[in-house]
């Protein structure tokens, strides 16, 4: 993304490409139209490309580890700042700032924060709900470093949760 059709065509000609495989599930209409106008046969090969992307060399694994280290550091730090009365939005904003502070280029995706009953929502969008004493908070987040992304989900309690919530958490 972010490169022009001339750049793509130039690289493909440099390699004397005749056929170009693409991820049909991930290509926008504009990108498809750009490729369609070029003198190459287009092959929808999402599975082939996905299978190739699964295999990582040592350098790629190191980049993934960097992204995970950033996310780990940001999460450890944000736990020091979570307090009763803080909103989900405030927690998300603090966390997103920490991703960058610890060396992330960006988030892997929009940070999910759900507190109390919102934690049961599959993809809780952070809202104005204030975190209450005894709430469990669910966060789903990741860091992007050099194009490589981490993804992790964590659940933690703020204050002392009731016995029933502890029992459910431990299932």
Model regions and ranges:
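Active-site neighborhoods and metal-handling regions in enzymes and metal-associated proteins
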Residues: 1-171
């Amino acid at each position: 993304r972010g490169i022009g059709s001339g750049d793509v065509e130039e690289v493909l000609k440099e390699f004397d490409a005749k056929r170009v495989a693409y991820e049909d599930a991930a290509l926008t209409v504009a990108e498809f139209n750009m490729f369609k106008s070029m003198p190459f046969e287009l092959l929808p090969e999402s599975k082939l490309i996905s299978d190739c992307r699964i295999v990582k060399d040592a350098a790629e694994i190191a980049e993934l580890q960097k992204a995970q280290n950033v996310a780990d550091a940001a999460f450890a730090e944000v736990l020091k700042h979570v307090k009763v009365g803080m909103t989900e939005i405030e927690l998300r904003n603090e966390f997103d700032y920490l991703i960058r502070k610890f060396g992330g280029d960006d988030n892997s995706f929009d940070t999910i924060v759900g507190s109390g009953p919102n934690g049961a929502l599959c993809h809780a969008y952070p809202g104005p709900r204030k975190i209450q004493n005894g709430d469990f908070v669910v966060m789903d987040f990741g860091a992007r470093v050099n194009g490589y992304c981490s993804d992790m989900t964590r659940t933690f309690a703020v204050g002392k949760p009731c016995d029933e919530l502890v029992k459910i958490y431990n299932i």
